[in-house]
């Protein structure tokens, strides 16, 4: 019985996606986290390096607001938002180049996206703010 339990534990462990323990702080890649500087280049560099080095966790620090345009998520990357961290979509619509609907620009523009990638996580206790307008849903508070 003990052997069976150990065997099942091994199988479950092997079935989980493998995420490296390497940690990449976006501030180390030049992110300001002040809510007005475009941090997309720094965030993308952190994601690229993390994936190229075998994967790990890209951390957005607590108490900071990271303004960002489109980000391509890559294999083996866990995008982790500390409690109190905010990932804020850049409101400048001109910077969004890819549409989920192909050539139909203006609809379904991609902010956080991946292509031919695997083992991606977006998690943590922070906030992802798509910077959308209130519109019809503004009347329904959280």
Residues of each region from the PLM?
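Positively charged n-region of N-terminal signal peptides that target proteins for export
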Residues: 1-4
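Extracellular/periplasmic carbohydrate-active domains that bind, remodel
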Residues: 19-142
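Bacterial N-terminal signal peptides
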Residues: 7-17
């Amino acid at each position: 019985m003990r052997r069976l339990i150990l065997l099942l534990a091994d199988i479950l462990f092997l079935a989980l996606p493998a995420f490296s323990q390497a940690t990449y702080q976006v501030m180390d890649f030049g992110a300001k986290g002040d809510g007005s500087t475009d941090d997309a280049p720094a965030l993308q560099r952190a994601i690229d390096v993390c994936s190229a080095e075998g994967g790990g966790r890209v951390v957005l620090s607590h108490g900071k607001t990271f303004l960002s345009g489109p980000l391509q998520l890559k294999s083996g990357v866990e995008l982790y938002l500390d409690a109190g961290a905010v990932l804020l979509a850049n409101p400048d619509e001109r910077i969004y180049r890819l549409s989920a609907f192909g050539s139909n620009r203006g609809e379904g523009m991609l902010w956080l996206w991946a292509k031919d990638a695997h083992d991606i996580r977006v998690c943590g206790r922070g906030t992802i703010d798509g910077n959308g307008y209130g519109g019809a849903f503004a009347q329904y508070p959280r």
